[in-house]
Amino acid sequence: MVRLTDSEKAEVVSLWSKVDEKIIGSEALGRLLVIYPWTQRFFEHFGDLSTADAIMKNPRVQAHGEKVLSSFGEGLNHLGDLKGTFAQLSELHCDELHVDPENFKLLGNILVVVLARHYGKEFTLEVQAAYQKFVAGMANALAHKYH
């Protein structure tokens, strides 16, 4: 469960209403793959991941980034039960994909950077603090089924 105050929740939801999941998701996932290249092993079937430019322009990275960000958006609708909401996704990443749960934290922190880049002055200290809590809750929920 993420414990956001009413004010924090309003900040997160307000900014999220402006988010283009395709653009922000694509950039966030692309940056994860560039900055932390060991994460590429989960996406080898996506084709060319040989350079930062290739990763950022890769249509499969872009599509998956949008899908990932859509899940974050879904999380906003279930702040009181993120673990239940993402139980199946957690099991998939744990049991089938064998993703290191630390990667969820990395992606969340990159998402915060990308949001700050795109929303500049709107991304105040208070908004960042609220988003850090939210992405930490998402990372915790996605890591919940790990043994």
Swiss-Prot record:
GO terms for molecular function: haptoglobin binding; heme binding; hemoglobin alpha binding; metal ion binding; organic acid binding; oxygen binding; oxygen carrier activity; peroxidase activity. CDD domains: Hb-beta-like. Red blood cells. InterPro entries: Globin, Globin-like_sf, Globin/Proto, Hemoglobin_b, Hemoglobin_oxygen_transport. GO terms for cellular component: blood microparticle; haptoglobin-hemoglobin complex; hemoglobin complex. Heme b binds at H64, H93. Residues 3-147 form the Globin domain. Signal peptide: none annotated. GO terms for biological process: hydrogen peroxide catabolic process. Keywords: Heme, Iron, Metal-binding, Oxygen transport, Transport. PROSITE patterns: GLOBIN. PANTHER family: HEMOGLOBIN FAMILY MEMBER (PTHR11442), HEMOGLOBIN SUBUNIT BETA (PTHR11442:SF42). Belongs to the globin family. This is Hemoglobin subunit deltaH.
